[in-house]
A protein has these predicted regions:
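Short, well-structured N-terminal submotif of metal-dependent ribonuclease cores
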Residues: 1-14, 23-40, 97-100, 106-107
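Short beta-strand scaffold positions
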Residues: 14, 44, 65, 83-84
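Alpha-helix N-cap/helix-start capping motif
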Residues: 16, 26, 47, 86-87
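Acidic, metal-associated active-site segment
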Residues: 22, 64-80, 88
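Short, flexible helix/strand-to-coil boundary loops that buttress conserved ligand/catalytic motifs
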Residues: 26, 57, 93
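Acidic catalytic patch
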Residues: 39-60, 86
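Acidic, PIN/NYN-like endoribonuclease modules and their adjacent C-terminal/linker elements
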Residues: 75-107
Length: 107
């Protein structure tokens, strides 16, 4: 999915908590390194973004803070979120205000 986005000329941006979520061991290190090298920008999570994510979790009764951080980071731009959990991400996007230019794509 990241390679496809790159071929389409899209920037690949990843909030740093996502790396913690996927970096749990038991994975192919070379594959992880290739994936991380394909990322254009890693976003540090600000206090405002973390608080926005908390509000989204409260609105949805979901518990995955990393998902909420991804949506909070995306909320101010025309963005496609690539995710293996489109249901929860979709709920968070809706809670943030439908039609704001954030799209969810399952991978």
């Amino acid at each position: 999915a990241i390679r496809r986005a790159r071929r389409k000329g899209r920037r690949v941006v990843v909030p740093t908590p996502v790396v913690a979520q996927v970096h749990r061991g038991g994975w192919d290190r070379a594959s992880m390194d290739r994936t991380l090298k394909a990322v254009d920008t890693f976003l540090e999570t600000s206090l405002d973004t973390a608080m926005h994510a908390g509000v989204l979790l409260g609105r949805t009764d979901l518990t995955h803070a990393v998902d909420a951080i991804v949506v909070a980071e995306a909320s101010n731009s025309l963005t496609t979120i690539l995710t293996s959990d489109p249901d929860d991400i979709g709920r968070l996007v809706e809670a943030d205000g439908a039609g704001r230019g954030v799209y969810v794509e399952a991978v």
